[in-house]
Curated annotation (Swiss-Prot):
Gene3D superfamilies reported in the protein's UniProt record: Ribosomal protein L10e/L16
HAMAP family with a match to the protein in the record: Ribosomal_uL16_arch
A GO CC term attached to the entry: ribonucleoprotein complex
This protein's record includes keyword Ribonucleoprotein: yes
NCBIfam families reported in the protein's UniProt record: PRK04199.1-3, PRK04199.1-4
Protein keywords: Ribonucleoprotein, Ribosomal protein
Molecular function per GO: structural constituent of ribosome
Protein name per UniProt: Large ribosomal subunit protein uL16
Top-rank taxon: Archaea
GO BP terms in the entry: translation
Family the UniProt entry places it in: Belongs to the universal ribosomal protein uL16 family.
Originating species: Methanosarcina mazei (strain ATCC BAA-159 / DSM 3647 / Goe1 / Go1 / JCM 11833 / OCM 88)
Disulfide pairings: none
Length: 173
């Protein structure tokens, strides 16, 4: 079956569905690393964060795409040990889909909306308004590279985002 568009799962419409103890066959998260860069040195002078402006659900595939993009830009511009990046949300929410048969004779095979609870197809992170998604710590000279990397990561996410300076604002002004 074809993967459904992320816009189907973006809005928070129902209560949380996270109790894996009662579910069979929850697909694993594609997000592998939550800490990247120089993990031994997390005390860089400038810290900036990517903040979600709206409440939404972000699929694990979108989180992984944003993480890869930001990490690639940071490694290219600041070097492997010139930054520390942390992904601050985890995809706990289990997403379901009621599969529909299509094509000739589908009405004989499909049960329509009868028993329409759906099967587990993926996971998502529930994000509140103004919640931090990514945090990057860098040296003063790598601030523009970190800002560019977070902007590119924000393009992969289903919500409007903003970049906020957490620490070291006086160093970069």
């Amino acid at each position: 079956m074809v993967r459904k568009p992320g816009s189907m799962y973006r809005n928070v419409r129902q209560r949380s569905f996270t109790r894996r103890k009662y579910m069979g066959g929850v697909p694993g998260s594609q997000v592998i690393h939550y800490d990247m860069g120089d993990k031994a040195n997390t005390t860089f002078p400038v810290k900036i964060s990517l903040v979600a402006e709206e409440k939404c659900q972000i699929r694990h595939t979108a989180l992984e795409a944003a993480r890869i993009t930001a990490n690639r830009h940071l490694v290219a511009d600041a070097g492997k040990m010139g930054f520390y990046m942390k992904l601050r949300v985890y995809p706990h929410e289990v997403l379901r889909e009621n599969k529909q048969a299509t094509g000739a004779g589908a009405d004989r095979v499909s049960s329509g909306m009868r028993r329409a609870f759906g099967k587990n197809v993926g996971t998502a992170a529930r994000v509140n308004s103004m919640q931090k998604l990514f945090t990057v710590a860098v040296e003063k000279q790598n601030f523009p590279a970190a800002k560019k990397a977070l902007w590119h990561a924000g393009q992969k996410l289903p919500t409007p985002v903003r970049i906020v300076i957490d620490e070291g604002a006086e160093l970069v002004q």
